[in-house]
Amino acid sequence: MAKKVILFLVEGETDEDALAVIFTRLVNNHDIKFEVLRTDITADEDMTVKYIEERIDKVIQKYLLKNPFVGDEDIIKLVQIIDTDGAFIPASLVKQSKNRKTEYFDTHIEAKNKNRLIRRNISKRNIVYSLYNRETVAGFPYEIYYFSRNMEHVLHDRAEDLTDDEKEDLAFDIADQYTDQPEKFLEYLYDDDFHVCGTYKDTWEFIMDGSHSLNRYCNVAVFFEQLEIGLEKESTK
């Protein structure tokens, strides 16, 4: 096949709607195309570090069965994007809710079921820590990036609970705004309000610290830096 493939693992339909076309446009001149696979394995309460690679491999094999003209040699990288959901905060910052709802704040979480949410956080933290320290998963080069606390929080500064319809509307807003000018989206990823500076590992150590995974942060710009697609290069075109 003419173009190499980056398999793009996202958590939901809104992520796909908002990002897939824009990312494809940004790498259009690099003989790369994105294939989007939907999976939310890091948030699966039954998932463990032991089985995470096996689960990702199943997602990839399912894709390859549906796309017989794509071979292992055509896939240059797996890229996973997750929402942090405040999962990396210390257990002491999870409080028992008094109104029987789970609510997220910049400094803590008030949980409907405190112990269950702490277990979820520990599980997700262990899985993500394992993943960002790996260079390969299922035999392919692998990278993982985050929106904190989630995509709507980063791209729209909307930290409140949103309905699925509201999330979809916001995703289409992003697609409409940046599809024809993807370099502006890349510029936005460096916004001082949420951009995390540093190396790939630096950005992960930062978000794992304290209450950062509750706050508005994003390291997706590093993905484009790894591909040598950056603001300097884009601005000289």
Where are these regions (language model features)?
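C-terminal accessory helical subdomains adjacent to catalytic cores in phosphodiester-
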Residues: 2-3, 17-46, 57-237
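Catalytic nucleophile-elbow at a beta strand-turn-alpha helix junction centered on a G-D-S/GDSL motif
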Residues: 7-19
